[in-house]
Amino acid sequence: MPAAQFDPDFTKNAFRNYLKEFYAEHSRQMKFCGNTPELFGEWKKSARQRVLELLSIDHLPVKTPEIQIINEVRYDNYTMQKIQYQTLPELVVPAYLFIPKNCSSPLPTLLCPPGHGNGINQVIEEEGAYYKYPHAFAEAGYIALVPEHISFGERSASGQSECRFDHEALNLLGSTVIGYRMWELQRSLDILESLPQVDSNRIGCAGLSLGGEMTLYLA
């Protein structure tokens, strides 16, 4: 291009503009375009399989971890146990397990994945956005399990979120941190289903922010 026609603004934005065009051409290739329940069922099956492929966790084992009880706090209507369990030989998951008292087992149960923040202790102690909601579930007669996500809270060396490094590292290794978190939550569900107090036909999931995102993936 002759010097007189050189446009520095075009050069600066050229690759971003290319990416926008590329995205417009290739985005939402799995969107649902049907109009019947039957077509939706077919789409859901293929979309679910594609999501699992993109999460890249098929190399991870499927087994129910054993839990270790660290301590227990007793409230009037329920107990709160601090527990931990191994999902891999190198990975330990701290968690809180809430069990109502004086209720007929098996009980309805909720898995409560935390959101972005300071982890499980924030969820069970903070009066703000979380409203200590696992305590409220236990008061209402639900068993509740609050597991610590990879990169947060007690699983962070700095005590702050380290998800950016873990996200980028796993991407370079051909996997995803979202996939690892979902896989660990699946193991949490396995633990709940193994407990005699739990009604395995009435297990739900409830989370805020990242916890809400992980609830969608689990569903």
Task: Name these PLM-found stretches.
Residues 137, 218-219:
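Aromatic pocket-lining residues of Rossmann-like dinucleotide-binding sites
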Residues 197-209:
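Alpha/beta-hydrolase fold nucleophile elbow
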Residues 1-27:
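Mature N-terminal, pre-catalytic/accessory segment of carbohydrate-active enzymes
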Residues 20-98:
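Non-catalytic accessory segments flanking enzyme active sites
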Residues 105-194:
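Cap/lid segment of the alpha/beta-hydrolase catalytic domain
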Residues 85-89, 99-101, 115-117, 151, ...:
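Short, flexible loop/turn elements at secondary-structure junctions
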Residues 207-217:
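Glycine-rich nucleophile elbow surrounding the catalytic serine of serine-hydrolase chemistry
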